[in-house]
């Protein structure tokens, strides 16, 4: 069994493209769909900040924004998870760079790859 977290950059909030409440609604619906299929996300972590944002409250060069490691540090601290028990699966280069910066393994997944191959890779890495 694994704990599953989402650590996501959400610059669209800082840029005024959508509201933080919209993102929370999306995460809520995602969680509902996962639960219908016997899965779940243990916790969502997000960075709504961007140095070039248009919304003053979110215009910030945050240490949480990947490829920086702030969100991973929070996950590790909040849940008492050691780095040797962490793996990051991401679809962007900034995700993979974040994992490197935090000294944990990573897998780049574009959503089109075979899920069985992904789970095989997870098993190999976490052994």
Give the residues covered by each predicted segment.
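Active-site neighborhood of HAD-like aspartate-dependent phosphohydrolases
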Residues: 1-3, 36
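Short beta-strand segments at enzyme active-site cores
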Residues: 3-9, 42-47
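A short secondary-structure junction motif
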Residues: 10-23
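A short acidic, glycine/proline-enriched capping/turn motif at secondary-structure boundaries
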Residues: 12-13, 48-53
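Asp-based, Mg2+/Mn2+-dependent phosphohydrolase catalytic module
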Residues: 20-43, 52-88, 92-127
